[in-house]
C-alpha cells in the first residue's frame, strides 16, 4: 500500500515555501504515471485568490500617469497583480463569490505597501511589505481592487467601447428602405459610365458646399448628438490578468530499489508555493482532485428498485402495541385509572396482570373485565398470564362444558328444578295462608336441595307440562291445600 513520506519543508522567503515528499512503494512503471498526473494538477487545478480589476481615481486608461506619484498606472497595476492573498478563516455564507474587494486611500509623502490595504476580515496579504507605489508630498492615491477565487490563469477582459456607451439597435433587413435612398440608387444606376469633366467638377463643388454647410452648423449637430462617455472618466475599470496559481513550481523524479527480491519505485516530488498554501496541503488537495477525477470514470452502480415492503407480523404487532387507550372506548372510570397509572397504550396495558390492575386505585373487577373484553374482541389479546378465549366457541358450547373447562362446579339446568314461583302459588291457593303453610315451607326447603347430575351427561330441557307434573309428584302441596279447603267448607264457623 503506497504512502507519503515527508522529507523536509522550509520557508525560503515571504512568498516562497518549499517541500519535498516521497511516495513509496509503487509498482514498476507507476512512478512516472502518478508523478506526471500530480504535477499537472498541482500547477493547474488548485484554487487561489487574485486581483482581477482595479478602479484608480483619476486614471482613464492603463498608460495614464497620476500627479505626484512616481509610478505610472501600468506599473501600479503590475504591482497589484503580484499581491498574494490568503484565506485565514471560514468565509461567510452570504458573501458573493465575486464581491470580494480591497481598498486603499492614502496621502503622501508615503510609501504604499500591501499592509495599507483594507481587506475583508477573513483574508490577509501573505507579504505585508510588498511594494505598490511612492507618493510625493500632497499627492493622494485612491483605488479599489476586486478579488476573485479561481484556478489557473485568467486573461483580462478587453473592450474598445468605453463603459456606458450604447450601440444603436440593428436594422431589420426585411424592412423597406426610405424613398429618397431608393431614388438616388435608381438614378445612379441609370447614369452612363462615361461622364464629362464638367460633371465631375460640378460634383466636387457640391461636396465642398456640403462640407462648408456642416462646418457652419457644427454647434447645432453637437447639441443634437447623443452623449458618448469620455475615455478620461474617473470611474473607469482597469482589468488585470489574474494569476490564481498557489503552486509556482513542481519537480519529480523516480528512483528504483529492490525490496524482498522485487523491483519497486519511489516517487520524489519537490513543490514550491507562493505562501498562500503549504506544500503539504497542496499535495493533499491534488490527490483528492485526482481521486474524484478517476472515480467519475467508473461504471455507475446498477439501479436497484426495491419492492414495496408488505406489512409483516412484527410491524402489525408494533402498530397494535402503540395504539393509544383513548381509541379503546373504555368507560370514564377505567380510562382515568389507567391514565393515572401512566398506561397510555395497548403495549403497556398487556404487560400488566389482572391482579396488578386490581391493585390500582378505584380499579375494580368490572373495569378489569371490561378491559379484558375489549382486548379480546378488538385485538385478540389478553392480559399477562391469561389466554385469549375464542368467543364463537364459547357461544356454541353448552353451559356444562364451559363450567367444567373453567373448573367451576357443574350446575343443573334450572328447567329441571321443581318450579314453585309466586304466580303458581297464587293460582293454586287463592285463599289466604293458613296453618298448613308451616309444613309447606318445610317441603319447599327440602325441594330446594340441588340434584347433582353426572359430569358426563347433561339433563335435557323438559317441557312446561313435565315441569308441572314433576313439581306435583315431588311436592304434596296441592293435596294438603285440598284437605284444608274441604275442612274449611265443612266447618265454616271454625274458620
UniProtKB/Swiss-Prot annotation:
Residues 444-453 have a biased composition (Basic residues). The keyword Nucleotidyltransferase applies. Residues 1-301 are annotated as: Alpha N-terminal domain (alpha-NTD). Residues 317-495 are annotated as: Alpha C-terminal domain (alpha-CTD). Its EC number is 2.7.7.6. Residues 159-227, 391-495 are annotated as: Disordered. It comes from the Eukaryota. It catalyses: RNA(n) + a ribonucleoside 5'-triphosphate = RNA(n+1) + diphosphate. GO terms for molecular function: DNA binding; DNA-directed RNA polymerase activity; protein dimerization activity. GO terms for biological process: DNA-templated transcription. Residues 207-219, 391-403, 464-473, 486-495 have a biased composition (Polar residues). Pfam families: RNA_pol_A_bac, RNA_pol_A_CTD, RNA_pol_L. Residues 170-237 are annotated as: Insert. Its main location: plastid. This is DNA-directed RNA polymerase subunit alpha. The gene is rpoA.
